[in-house]
Curated annotation (Swiss-Prot):
Gene: cmoB
One of the Pfam families matching this protein, by short name: Methyltransf_9
Family annotation (InterPro entries): CmoB (IPR010017), Mo5U34_MeTrfas-like (IPR027555), SAM-dependent_MTases_sf (IPR029063)
GO molecular function: methyltransferase activity; transferase activity, transferring alkyl or aryl (other than methyl) groups
Keyword annotations: Transferase, tRNA processing
Keyword hit for Transferase: yes
EC number(s) reported in the record: 2.5.1.-
Amino acids binding carboxy-S-adenosyl-L-methionine: 91, 105, 110, 130, 152-154, 181-182, 196, 200, 315
Catalytic function, reaction form: carboxy-S-adenosyl-L-methionine + 5-hydroxyuridine(34) in tRNA = 5-carboxymethoxyuridine(34) in tRNA + S-adenosyl-L-homocysteine + H(+)
Subunit record text: Homotetramer.
Family per record: Belongs to the class I-like SAM-binding methyltransferase superfamily. CmoB family.
UniProt organism field: Vibrio cholerae serotype O1 (strain ATCC 39315 / El Tor Inaba N16961)
Protein name: tRNA U34 carboxymethyltransferase
């Protein structure tokens, strides 16, 4: 069983978040009561990871921690074996006590692309929607965020996050909650909201943009990252079935069309700050994620297309303000 008491304590310290306490405890109680497949096994393995206070932590340039005296080889091997029971590791990388968790995604590359364009996170209250295992939340903390909350319904991501948290000294300035944004009240409370890799999974993308706006304070900033296609402000791809072997995908606008969507839902100062074709080096199979990955999803004869014949993955980052 997870103990979310620390989450409630952190929320209570922010008056603008206290409305959340009207619904969150019951939601998490209901979540705990459900059967979650491998969760019991993962929880048993999570308990094998000791909580320690690393002598060196770097969240500014990476997500890394170590002591001046390295772990004994046997202890390091035991820890690595436990961490590998939480396979697949999709978002990272992590460098923890001599163990390099080489994840499917080089999430640090995305962070490097967006960081020069966003408002400084120092002392900000931040929400990361669809946060995965929390890699970017640690990087937000490294930029000085006061408190970071992430939401993602995946049990495995929660386990991976809690494993990393233990190895980073049990830092309580960042929390991952197993929720979707549709379960959140309209808090109008966060200085910065991130939504990265979520929009194309939404049947109603404009509703998702409105949900994001309803979490921001007036003047707050949205960082939106999603799959896009080339084209003008009228261009939108709706895959017939799968896209790069993904089933649950719906709308792929051009970056210009997405800018129009943001303006239509009431955002201002909308900027397209980056467009990038995902390289085979940024998303690939590794020792820590042994399933198929991007190289298996693009046409081997023409890597500019997916195996279904659609344009290969292109991702855009847009930044917008809530008036």
């Amino acid at each position: 069983m997870f103990n979310f008491a620390n989450v409630y304590q952190q929320i209570a310290q922010h008056p603008q978040l206290q409305l959340w306490l009207n619904t969150l405890p019951q939601q998490l109680t209901d979540w705990q009561a459900k059967q979650h497949g491998d969760l019991d096994r993962w929880m048993r393995n999570l308990k094998k990871i000791p909580v320690g206070q690393p002598e060196v932590i770097d969240l500014k340039n990476a997500v890394a921690a170590h002591n001046h005296q390295p772990l004994a080889q046997g202890e390091q091997k035991k820890l690595e074996a436990v961490l590998k029971t939480f396979h697949p590791w999709r978002k990272g990388p992590y460098h923890l006590h001599g163990i390099h968790i080489d994840t499917e995604w080089r999430s640090d590359w995305k962070w490097d692309r967006l960081l020069p364009h966003i408002s400084p996170l120092k002392n900000r209250l931040v929400l990361d929607v669809g946060c995965g295992n929390g890699y970017h939340m640690w990087r937000m903390l490294g930029e000085g965020a006061q408190q970071v909350f992430g939401i993602d319904p995946s049990e495995l991501f929660l386990i991976q996050f809690e494993a990393v948290r233990k190895l980073l000294g049990d830092d309580q300035r960042v929390h991952l909650l197993p929720l979707g944004i549709e379960q959140m009240p309209e808090l109008n409370a966060f200085d910065t909201v991130f939504s990265m890799g979520v929009l194309y999974h939404r049947r109603s993308p404009l509703d998702h943009l409105l949900q994001l706006k309803n979490q921001l304070v007036a003047g707050g900033e949205l960082i939106l990252e999603t799959l896009v296609v080339e084209g003008d402000e009228h261009t939108v791809l709706v895959p017939f079935d799968r896209y790069a072997q993904m089933r649950n995908v719906y709308f792929f606008p051009s970056a210009l069309a997405l800018k129009v969507w943001l303006e239509k839902t009431g955002f201002v100062d909308v900027r397209i700050v980056d467009e990038n074709i995902t390289s085979l080096g940024e998303q690939r199979t590794t020792e820590w994620m042994t399933h198929n990955s991007l190289p298996d999803y693009v046409d081997p004869q023409d890597p500019s297309k997916t195996i279904e014949g659609y344009p290969a993955p292109r991702r855009a980052i847009l930044i917008a303000k809530k008036p």
